[in-house]
Amino acid sequence: MAPPPARVHLGAFLAVTPNPGSAASGTEAAAATPSKVWGSSAGRIEPRGGGRGALPTSMGQHGPSARARAGRAPGPRPAREASPRLRVHKTFKFVVVGVLLQVVPSSAATIKLHDQSIGTQQWEHSPLGELCPPGSHRSEHPGACNRCTEGVGYTNASNNLFACLPCTACKSDEEERSPCTTTRNTACQCKPGTFRNDNSAEMCRKCSRGCPRGMVKVKDCTPWSDIECVHKESGNGHNIWVILVVTLVVPLLLVAVLIVCCCIGSGCGGDPKCMDRVCFWRLGLLRGPGAEDNAHNEILSNADSLSTFVSEQQMESQEPADLTGVTVQSPGEAQCLLGPAEAEGSQRRRLLVPANGADPTETLMLFFDKFANIVPFDSWDQLMRQLDLTKNEIDVVRAGTAGPGDALYAMLMKWVNKTGRNASIHTLLDALERMEERHAREKIQDLLVDSGKFIYLEDGTGSAVSLE
C-alpha cells in the first residue's frame, strides 16, 4: 500500500510582493526576485520589467523598459522564473485532486463491503420471508434474527416478534423446577408441603395434615393436588375383594373350563364313571410326565384285571365268585379308559394290512398320486432319503418328470422298484415319524383306512379290525 502523500502547505509556493516603501531599487528588485511575483494588493501576478506585455506605469502608459528609455539597447531577456513555479503549483493541485478521487471511492467501497458482510451473516440466520426460529426474534434489519439472551428472554416457537418474551421469576411461595432458556420459560412449582390446583390458581395452599375421622389416605400431597382420602369401608375392603376375585376366582374358572373341554373330547359318551376317570387322568398330564406314565399304567392294569376277571367268569359260570374288594369294569368303560391313554401307542402297535388279502405293495401303489397333496413339498427329498434313495437317484427322477407335482409319485415308484417287497406302508409311516411329520402320517393312515383298502390288524391277536 502506497504511503499517504505528504502535506504541502500552499504558502510554500506563494511569493509575497515586496512592500512599496522598501529601499530596494527597481533594478535590485528585478535582480533579486523573479520577473513574475504575486501582487499584494491586486491578488494576481504582476510582471515587472519592460517588453511586450508590460504592465502600465504609474502614469498609466505602456512603454519600453527603463533601459530603453535610458537610450540603451535592450539586451537579452532574463530567464523567466515564474513559469516553472506556476507549473509546479498546478501539477500539485492535479495530484491532490487525483489522490482524493481515489481515496473517497475506495473508502466508500470498504464501507459497502463491510455492510454486505454483516448483511450476509444475518441472512444466513433467517432467510427473507421466513419466521425466526425458536430462541430468537426479528431484528430491525430485514431478514435478520437476533438470539434471545439466556435467562432473560425466550421464544418457544417460530415468530416475527421484535423482542423476546421476558422470563418469568418464581414467586416467593414457589421453587424453580427448571430454569429459563432461550426456548422455554421458567417452570415453577409450589414448595414441598403446599399445592396449587384449579381452585387456587394464583397462590399455593398448605397441604392437609391428615384425613378426617373414618377416612384413610390413599394419595399423598403433590405440588398440584392435596391429599386424597376415602372412607375405610370403600377403601381397603374394596381392594381386598378385588384381589381375591382376581387371584382365586379367575384361575378356578380356567380350570373348570379346561376340565369340561377334556371331558367332552374323551369319547366316553354319557358314562359318568368313564368321564370321571378320563378327566382325572388328563388332569394328571398337568403334573408332569411321571404322573402321565402312572395314570397310563393304572389304566393298563385295570384292563388286565378286567380280562382276567372275564375269563374266570366264563370258566366258573356255575360257581359263585367272591368279588369282595375287586373292582369290576364293563368292557365299554375299559375301552373308554384305554382310548385316550393309548391313542398314539395303539396306532404304533396296530398294523395296517390290505383288506381281503390283497397284495400290500400293489395296494399301496394305488395311493402314491394322492400322497403329493399330503406330504409337504419341502419334505419330499428328505422322505426319499429316509427311504434309502441317493441324491443322484432323486435328481435323475426329478429331471425326468414332466412337472413338479409328479416328482413324488416318480420317486415313490423308484423306491418300490429299488426295494421290491420291502416297500411297505409301515416303512413309509416310520420314515414320516422320524421326520416329525406326524400330521402327514396320520392323514395317510386315515386315507388308507377310509378307502376300505386297508384295515388295522391288532398286534398279537391276529384279528383284523376295520375302522370303516
UniProtKB/Swiss-Prot annotation:
Q: Where is this region: Disordered?
A: 17-82
Q: List GO BP terms, alphabetically.
A: activation of NF-kappaB-inducing kinase activity; apoptotic process; cellular response to mechanical stimulus; extrinsic apoptotic signaling pathway; extrinsic apoptotic signaling pathway via death domain receptors; positive regulation of apoptotic process; signal transduction; TRAIL-activated apoptotic signaling pathway
A GO MF annotation of the entry reads:
death receptor activity
TNFR-Cys repeat positions in this chain? Answer: 107-145, 147-188, 189-229
Q: Which residues carry this modification: Phosphoserine?
A: 424, 463, 466
In the record, the effect of residue 274 to S is given as: No effect on palmitoylation
Q: Which residues cross the membrane?
A: 240-262
List every position bearing Omega-N-methylarginine.
52
Q: Kindly indicate whether the keyword Cell membrane belongs to this entry.
A: yes
Q: What is its main location?
A: membrane
Q: Where is the signal peptide?
A: 1-23
Please provide, in alphabetical order, the Gene Ontology terms of the cellular component aspect for this entry: cell surface; cytosol; Golgi apparatus; membrane raft; plasma membrane; plasma membrane raft
Topological domain ranges for the Extracellular compartment: 24-239
**Superkingdom assignment:** Eukaryota
Known role: Receptor for the cytotoxic ligand TNFSF10/TRAIL. The adapter molecule FADD recruits caspase-8 to the activated receptor. The resulting death-inducing signaling complex (DISC) performs caspase-8 proteolytic activation which initiates the subsequent cascade of caspases (aspartate-specific cysteine proteases) mediating apoptosis. Promotes the activation of NF-kappa-B.
Protein name per the record: Tumor necrosis factor receptor superfamily member 10A
**Organism in which the protein naturally occurs:** Homo sapiens
Q: Which gene encodes it?
A: TNFRSF10A
